[in-house]
Amino acid sequence: MTNTRKTHPLIKIINHSFIDLPAPSNISAWWNFGSLLGLCLAIQILTGLFLAMHYTSDTMTAFSSVTHICRDVNYGWLIRYMHANGASMFFICLFLHVGRGLYYGSYTYFETWNIGVILLFVVMATAFMGYVLPWGQMSFWGATVITNLLSAIPYIGTTLVEWIWGGFSVDKATLTRFFAFHFVLPFIIAALVMVHLLFLHETGSNNPSGLISDSDKIPFHPYYTIKXILGVLLLILALMILVLFSPDLLGDPDNYTPANPLSTPPHIKPEWYFLFAYTILRSIPNKLGGVLALVFSILILSLFPLLHVSKQRSMMFRPLSQCMFWFLVADLLTLTWIGGQPVEYPFITIGQLASILYFTIILLMLPIVSLIENKLLKW
């Protein structure tokens, strides 16, 4: 008798992806973040759907509708804070997932990596538009500042900004279209995730050693399903601790003040997960230069496959490259810290140095160190 799991047209796709998938026997907990990102996306889509049932995308009522969700809707406060803090968990998992890819050389899977970079851009765009929806002070001014950056594009800049705004300032039209995009983009993300997985399953997973593991594979289920469940439980635990004990820890108090175009907050800053890019943006005095640096700070990830000059794939056996990697991590943490500080001495200088260092480590130091290691190993 044939097994339905292996013959049914639909179930066999799931079987080949999550059950009988041959996986390397030595992948560590760093390989858990893919499944955790899938969980985060599912949580965000579900909580977002229930929030959208009660939210109104009108400048007059948006702020009140969020208040109404928190006060009057059954467990509305829970849904709202799970969605807000779920975004933070999403980005923590994203950064760790990308960091894992950089450390172990997963970027040599060219298509998978580039789809991942596109996913990162789309997730960042979605999160930015979501932050505008509660229509608090930081929502409004964040939207104004970031959309205004497009005016730095020569010739078409100003027209482009007014086209995105749907008027001459961030207003009702902007809020409505941001809500529409914020609703639809997660489904586009889900489709891109499918493509990401499609390309990944063409090659199979990388592993910590960076070596081909075809001779040593184990079935995904039960070994990695159990492992993934542990990760899921830990993620839900972390999320619920955040939601139930300090839901506003990562938020901005200014967003509890309704949007007022006549009053600018003293320090306009985005959510914590954008601070590193925000620092790079404001480290350059020139507007267009800042915008280009901002875009390139993420786009630079797609250059990693081209910058890989080492004879080894993973950094597991390359101590000098490991040092450079952790310098890069420390630099990103510095950039994140500076992004939350006011624009004054010494923060401006630290931000500029950290921004220069970020690009220097990636474009110069990592390849040079890799070449030195090749020489040391007489390759």
Swiss-Prot record:
UniProt entry tagged with the keyword Signal: no
UniProt entry keywords in alphabetical sequence: Electron transport, Heme, Iron, Membrane, Metal-binding, Mitochondrion, Mitochondrion inner membrane, Respiratory chain, Transmembrane, Transmembrane helix, Transport, Ubiquinone
Biological processes per GO annotation: mitochondrial electron transport, ubiquinol to cytochrome c
UniProt superkingdom: Eukaryota
GO molecular function: metal ion binding; ubiquinol-cytochrome-c reductase activity
GO cellular component terms attached to this protein's record: mitochondrial inner membrane; respiratory chain complex III
Cofactors that this protein relies on: heme b
Protein name: Cytochrome b
Organism: Cynomys leucurus (White-tailed prairie dog)
Gene: MT-CYB
